[in-house]
Amino acid sequence: MRRLFFCFMAMMGVLTLSAQSVYENEVINNIMTRTSIRQYTNEPVSKADIETMLRAGMAAPTAVNKQPWHFIAVTNKEKLAELAGRRGMIKQAGVAIVVCGNLDKAMQGKAQEYWIQDCSAATENILLAAKALGLGAVWTGCYPMDDRVTEVFKVLKLPETIVPLCVIAIGHPAEQPTPKNKWKPENVSYNEFGGKAE
């Protein structure tokens, strides 16, 4: 009996080890194992989780701390269907977060385009927050594709100074794709283009 007990405990140890994170650091592991999820269950996304993701988005860095963004959380099923167009995953999502640039809050002149970087950083934060909450998400682009931007403008009744960068479809995952290993040393240089590590 004792032998059976120890065998069972050893098996549990192996299972625990195999289920451990690839990286010990939780944040790094979250980044490395995040992947696009395009299929969702019918379970709704809670208001608390939506707010957490929005807070994560607003925690992103911005040029001169302008925070030139506006977020629209869409949970209404009819609106989601309108917003989806050819992107079916949005229709079945529990929520879609539309990340927009607010040109009234953006820097002026050539620097105005920094809103794109700022809102992209916010988008990645939302994707990582979704992963941390056990949700699945996928980033679908709008700007600078005129047809997509116009479509979102119309559905969400946006004023001219609010420009949709992307629509993030989010829900409880109905698929578990294996994260891709995107590490490619040939895409890295040190000290100058083509430079090798010392």
Please state what every model-predicted region is.
Residues 6, 18-198:
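Acidic, surface-exposed loops and disordered segments
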Residues 1-4:
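Positively charged n-region of N-terminal signal peptides that target proteins for export
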Residues 10-18:
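Hydrophobic h-region of N-terminal signal peptides that target proteins for export
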